Each structure stands twice: as C-alpha cells, then as structure tokens.
Amino acid sequence: MNLLTTSCQAVAHAAGQFNVYWRNGLQGAGLMSVSVHRSLPDPEVIAELSALQWLLCQRAVFGATQNGKGLSLKVSAGAIRKAVRAITAGDAEQFGKPHLKPYAHFLATRFAGAELEVDKDRSWIPERLPSDHATLSIRQPLPNTVEISGVGVVAVSKHAFERFGKWLCMQAGHDTWRLLRRMM
C-alpha cells in the first residue's frame, strides 16, 4: 500500500502562507510552501488539498498511473475527509463548506477508493528544512489532467469524468480513471 502523509502549518506573520510537510511512506520528508490567495476561505485546508493534488498528480510521487486503489492518505485537516465524504455522497452543499468541493474533487474521482485518515501527529516532521522543497501558489483549484499522446496535457472536467463513468457503467471511481487514462 502506498502511504502519503501531510501536515499543514501556517507560517508565522505571513497571512495566506503555509508550510505543508509531506512524507512518502515512512522515510523521506519534503516541504511545500503554499501561498493561498487571501480571498479564499479555509486557506489552511485549501493549502493542504492543493499540495496533495500537486504531489499525487503533477509530481506523481507514486507514479503517473496511481489511482485510489492501494493508496492511503494521512492528512492533518478533518475537513478534507468530510469534504470527500460529502462529494461522494452527493451532498456537498449539506456539508457546510461547499467552497472546498472543487479543491477536494480529485480525491473523489481520480483517487476514489483511497483510504483517508486524519492524523494530527507531527513528530515525524524534521527539525531542519527538508532538501526536497517546492513552491505552489493557489488562486483557484488545480485542474485534473491527463496526458494524451499527440495532444499534450488536457484537463478533465467533472462532467466529462462522470459521463465517461456512466457510459462504462462503472461502479468504482478508480477503475473509471484508469480506463479513461488508458483510452487516452
């Protein structure tokens, strides 16, 4: 099972700036400096969700073909798990924080079926800054993308993903993403 652990901490005296520490499995820690636009509500949750998406999709820490099957995520914000559950159940508006829905959408589609656990333990965070460091600036949700040979990187909308799943009569979201990627 692939394990990705993240922990988000606000940077002191810097509004909208967050350090998202991450580790792949039990070894190797990294750091993402995430800047969230000041107009966005719940910036710490958005920072952690955006870092997760960047690590899983753009950086592909578990490979480009990884989907939710065999993936375990430990996050520090309970709102992430609640948002994914609300999206999966189809009642994101009842969740109370519908503005998080576009940021958590990738976990309910491409990474559907991933085990999601809230863990506040920060003892694994190194005292020194990790050598693996990246920067991310967020004004809007990152797109869900797939690479199509001969075309390049293409964003997959929620509507396209859902229609493709219905067309295939698929039950599991991770199978839908895998087959969509294979067809592309």
Language-model features: locations:
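RNase H-like nuclease fold core
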Residues: 1-44
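Ser/Thr- (and often Asn-) enriched beta-sheet segments in non-cytosolic proteins
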Residues: 17-21, 33-35, 72-74, 115-117, ...
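Acidic helix/loop or adjacent segment enriched in Glu/Asp that either coordinates divalent metal
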Residues: 34-66
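Conserved short-loop catalytic and cofactor-binding motifs
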Residues: 35, 39, 91, 148
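A charged amphipathic helix-loop-strand protein-protein interaction module that recurs
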Residues: 50, 175-184
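RNase H catalytic domain
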Residues: 59-125
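Juxtamembrane and targeting peptides
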Residues: 115-149
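Arg/Lys-rich, positively charged N-terminal/basic patches that mediate binding to nucleic acids
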Residues: 139-176
